[in-house]
Amino acid sequence: MVIFGLTGGIGSGKSLVASYFSTFFKAKIFDADKVVHELYKYDSDVIRLVSEYFPDSVDNGIVDRNNLRQHFLTDNHLWVEFQSVIHAIVLKKKKDFIMLHNRRSVRYVVLDIPLLIESNFYSCCDFIIHVTTSRLLQMQRVLRRGLSIKEFESIRCKQLSESSRKKFANFTIRTGLSKKDILFQIKKIMLNVNNKCNMD
């Protein structure tokens, strides 16, 4: 099994790259955002945890993610404590995901985790791919999700710089180009990786 980790700022195109790995190389994708979304929606222990830390973010047992995001943006000590618990749960689910697909002899696994580097989720990766694009395109993508420019800038400031990400990366994919070009970049990486794996 080869494990890829995707690192990139908000709106850089990580999910787009992950979808290409899934479609063209049958990779299994661990989508941390989806995992957390499901925890907030269905996990009673997590919903209870949210209500303990941020009572105004839960109404009748339903987590208001927009409200919860505002607590993240304030960057207070409560959020740091809360986030550490959520990260521990996600880490366990990531390990279970990898073990499951290893038993099934899956060839490729891709970790699509926003804080891959910052939260040390990358230690199990064989290769790290830095996904990048222009700041303008990042902002356009984020605004389409319903976030404001202020929220985009605030989140972006809390994330690692592009230069810091590059230090961890084995490869870089630029997503501000055509879909055909993005696929070409991925195919080039896969050729490189498969050649390396065959040599080892």
Curated annotation (Swiss-Prot):
Residues annotated for ATP binding in this entry: 11-16
Reaction equation(s) it catalyzes: 3'-dephospho-CoA + ATP = ADP + CoA + H(+)
Q: Name one GO cellular component term.
A: cytoplasm
Keywords assigned: ATP-binding, Coenzyme A biosynthesis, Cytoplasm, Kinase, Nucleotide-binding, Transferase
Please provide the Gene Ontology terms (biological process) for this protein: coenzyme A biosynthetic process
Question: What is its subcellular localisation?
Answer: Cytoplasm
Q: Quick one: which pathway?
A: Cofactor biosynthesis; coenzyme A biosynthesis; CoA from (R)-pantothenate: step 5/5
Which Enzyme Commission numbers does its entry carry? 2.7.1.24
Q: What is its main location?
A: cytoplasm
Q: Which top class of enzyme applies to this chain?
A: transferase
Q: Which InterPro entries match?
A: Depp_CoAkinase (IPR001977), P-loop_NTPase (IPR027417)
Please provide, alphabetically and separated by semicolons, the GO molecular function terms listed in this UniProt record: ATP binding; dephospho-CoA kinase activity
**Stored Gene3D superfamilies:** P-loop containing nucleotide triphosphate hydrolases (3.40.50.300)
DPCK domain location, by residue? Answer: 3-200
Q: What does this protein do?
A: Catalyzes the phosphorylation of the 3'-hydroxyl group of dephosphocoenzyme A to form coenzyme A.
Q: Which family does it belong to?
A: Belongs to the CoaE family.
- NCBIfam families under this entry? dephospho-CoA kinase (TIGR00152)
Q: What is this protein called?
A: Dephospho-CoA kinase
Please spell out the taxonomic lineage of the organism that makes this protein. Bacteria, Pseudomonadati, Pseudomonadota, Alphaproteobacteria, Rickettsiales
The gene for this chain is coaE
